[in-house]
Curated annotation (Swiss-Prot):
Functions in nuclear protein import as nuclear transport receptor. Serves as receptor for nuclear localization signals (NLS) in cargo substrates. Is thought to mediate docking of the importin/substrate complex to the nuclear pore complex (NPC) through binding to nucleoporin and the complex is subsequently translocated through the pore by an energy requiring, Ran-dependent mechanism. At the nucleoplasmic side of the NPC, Ran binds to the importin, the importin/substrate complex dissociates and importin is re-exported from the nucleus to the cytoplasm where GTP hydrolysis releases Ran. Residues 316-336 are annotated as: Disordered. Residues 34-102 form the Importin N-terminal domain. HEAT repeats lie at residues 13-39, 44-82, 91-124, 130-167, 177-207, 220-247, 259-286, 302-380, 388-419, 431-458, 476-509, 517-550, 558-596, 604-652, 663-694, 702-739, 747-783, 791-824, 833-865. SUPFAM superfamilies: ARM repeat. GO terms for molecular function: small GTPase binding. One of its GO terms (cellular component) is nucleoplasm. This is Transportin-1. It comes from Oryza sativa subsp. indica (Rice).
Amino acid sequence: MAAAALWQPQEEGLREICTLLDAHISPNSDQARIWQQLQHYSQFPDFNNYLVFLLARGEGKSFEARQAAGLLLKNNLRATFSSMPPASQQYVKSELLPCIGATNKAIRSTVGTVISVLFQIVRVAGWIELFQALHQCLDSNDLDHMEGAMDAIYKICEDVPEELDVDVPGLPERPINVFMPRLLQFFQSTHAILRKLALGCINQYIVVMPAALYMSMDQYLQGLFNLAKDPSADVRKLVCSAWVQLIEVRPSILEPHLKNVTELMLQANKDSDDEVALEACEFWSAYCDVSMPPEGLREFLPRLIPTLLSNMSYSDDDESLADAEEEESFPDRDQDLKPRFHASRLHGSETGEDDDDDDAVNVWNLRKCSAAGLDVLSNVFGDDILPTLMPLIQQNLARTDDDAWKEREAAVLSIGAIAEGCITGLYPHLPQIVAFLIPLLDDKFPLIRSITCWTLSRYSKFIVQSLEHPNGREQFDKILLGLLRRVLDTNKRVQEAACSAFATLEEEAAEELVPHLGIILQHLMCAYGKYQRRNLRILYDALGTLADAVGAELNQAKYLDIFMPPLITKWQQLANSDKDLFPLLECFTSIAQALGPGFSQFAEPVFQRCINLIQSQHLAKVDPAAAGALYDKEFIVCALDLLSGLAEGLGAGIESLVSQSSLRDILLQCCMDEAADVRQSALALLGDLSRVCPIHLHPRLQEFLNVAAKQLNPQCVKEAVSVANNACWAIGELAIKIGKEISPVVITVVSCLVPILKSPEGLNKSLLENSAITLGRLCWVCPDIVAPHMDHFMQAWCNALCMIRDDFEKEDAFHGLCAMVAANPTGAVGSLTFICQACASWNEIKSEGLHNEVCQILNGYKQMLGSGGWEQCMSTLEPAVVQRLGRYGV
């Protein structure tokens, strides 16, 4: 301590740093230059001493400059504390403690933040004095000191709650055991800020549940009940948050109190403060998600449903209302462009999720939470909610005056929210619902037009299912044309909702769209000419979805002439560094796959652009100035995925493009990229090229195989399962094309696939299926290498084969199974029941050759075992399995 106390700042250094901090907080300063100067000062070993001195003792300096010193100190400590001289470390710690109760709130708060960051580095044992100081502040009865201590404790609880629940040499008890009674006492404080901070601290422990909280649970719950009507909205919000967390992670604790808690949450859901109501509203979804007995909620439905419906109306200050009137002539601002995320290509089971968002602006609010709650309730209680809900909806819809448009809009939203859960009761009335919604597409209020688009999209699946019903086609046509009409709306919010809804309808309708292709394309391309950047992204998605839905039907000159010229014009206009290329690349990927060989007339410039994009990004990675752009891996991912789409669409027709390019070397580089999503897309392309032109991979074949095999080691699988999935698939594709040339990596790959096949739940279904298929392909082409090891994997492999649907990939895997048995029939006999189950998993083997092979194997075993042994084997199988095996003549 003595050495630390000797440190004193030099006046000149202090003055320079103060001047710099004053400039730093000035709005008109050159921040880049100031940042450089701060970096220069940070090289000095005692720079942090100056910062903590200014924060703690900067009397006469502006509070803003002292705060800036504290925030700079916080960031520096994160990066440099462990390398600071011990005397400086001690000085920083000792200067912070007296400031916990600083009279200025901003300084107190900054000190609490710095303490929390420093605590994360040194932990309890490295700063025992902190806890002594916090106790003294809590016991001081001075509000500034109590609040400062509570603020610091709250920030520690928020960042590392588990660190207070540890035994520490030198302390008689765990810190949380000492703090917990004090925190619970503060529930009764006359100061709202102390009640809020105490409750906030304890709430951080609901998930980790230390003994200190578990043993005080009755007192904590009683405190929550007492604070439910607290005058402070912040406190009431935290009470609701506590109930939501408890029901999510400790529902058994709430069960005895559930009725009382539900009543309180129902009241809180009507709170005059929207944030309290929003927190309370989360309770209903949480209740249903943890599978609490629904009967406990049923008696509240007659009061809960009207509350949810009431809260689904736009509030007057909802920020969505601000841009609701924005016409297409308004230029998009950069902040209007939501960040977009491209999903890298994945081979295997599809895991895409619907985005049922009813609002263009993704801000979670009471309206959306209420709609989500109604959706969840409809899925739990089904049609039972309709007698309460439908009269309320009808009542709101009957209010046709302009002042009631928000209530009408909420009614339409609620019809959409219950589309899945209440469909049994609603399905007979679908024609009336649709007939009612169609005119609302032309409502004078744009937000009613937009929500009607969304609600119709929620019923798309059922509308398509009704096509063969009387008037079903007429109903479908009206919806299709109605949505297309709104795609051309002049309001940007309506355009967005209509385009998204139309994409959903496309997914459900698929080939039913074919008779309407001309009119669909005319509308979409008319919109293409008038949309601004944000809605263009959604339009690209609608075009890509259309291509996925109708496939080769799009490959007709009359259609190509409508949509390809505008797309190509845009493609040529956009620079290689323009992020508006992303959705266009994705759109072209779907179009290339749909058109197949029909895309060949457009392929060469598209292929070359993809190569250029990847090369320019590789350059940007090492030399942004030479590339003229900053590195952005998403360009590489999108370009690789479009090349995959070309390979899939053109098939062997891509060979001439690949042979004249440097794609092979570029692809190998991408397969080794440090970014998982780049490797994922690169390995997908490797698999696609293996299918259509493996000859061009040959010069670097072993390198590709080694890189792909490396992605299957257990650590890589754990870190990036989707990369492993694509690597596995690519190796399987290569195996059937190159045969014995794959032998150098066979044992490495098999040794990685076996743990995947044997793993209990938790591994991705797609990886499991691809592992079973690739193992089968390796067994097929190199049976002599794999057969000696079959007892390690046969049973797990057969179990996985049972899960795979009938297709050519399953056929390949079964060729491998037959090759294994042929190579070592006695070695496989111990797994015979599993082999039988796998053979019985086929609905029908289309390949006559494979069917005969399976017959041969099973009959061979029947002869080997004799009738007694065979009957014994059959007796262990389900009767349905034995019956299916009859198809193979056994």
